[in-house]
Amino acid sequence: RGMSSAASDVYKRQSLKDDPASIGRRTNFATVYLLKKEDGSLDKVILPIHGYGLWSTLYGFIALEKNGNDIFGLQFYQHAETPGLGAEVDNPKWKAQWKGKKLNNDSGELMITVAKTQKYKDHHIDALAGATLTSNGVDNLVKFWMGESGFKKFLKNLQNGAA
């Protein structure tokens, strides 16, 4: 294929059969950020994420440690969720829960969850009080982007030194 044809693939969007994040379509490629230490070694991986909450699409980033499994943080930069309820995704106390949590268990199964009840300590984020649909949306979008239709293959390649 010619260069212009390959370049245009970057902007192609594909429909999703399994769409828990309610985004309808996703691009074939995404910009990821690899933060490096002064010595050039990998420090953090920052991945773009988005998905529907209650009133809006939440756009943000999830930062992972270099192992691609330990969460360093989650930040949304755009949303229109209800102030005092779903907009609590911006609350520093709620965001602090993400640091140190693990995406996957030792078998590589995606386990991270946003829920009212704690199932697995290393993988649990408390749901937002009074904002069930926003909490479900965050849970769904994180699972989507960290799963098979999202960045799972990239993260596995990263862990194997192939990314």
Label the model's feature ranges.
Residues 121-126, 130, 134-163:
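Extracytoplasmic/luminal low-complexity segments enriched in Pro/Gly and acidic/polar residues
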Residues 3, 36, 64-65:
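Hydrophobic alpha-helical segments, especially N-terminal targeting/anchoring helices
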Residues 9-31, 35-36:
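Short N-terminal edge-element motif at the start of the domain
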Residues 30-61, 78:
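Structured beta-strand/loop patches that form or line metal/cofactor-binding pockets in enzymes
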Residues 51-58, 67-124, 128:
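Flexible, solvent-exposed short loops/turns enriched in glycine
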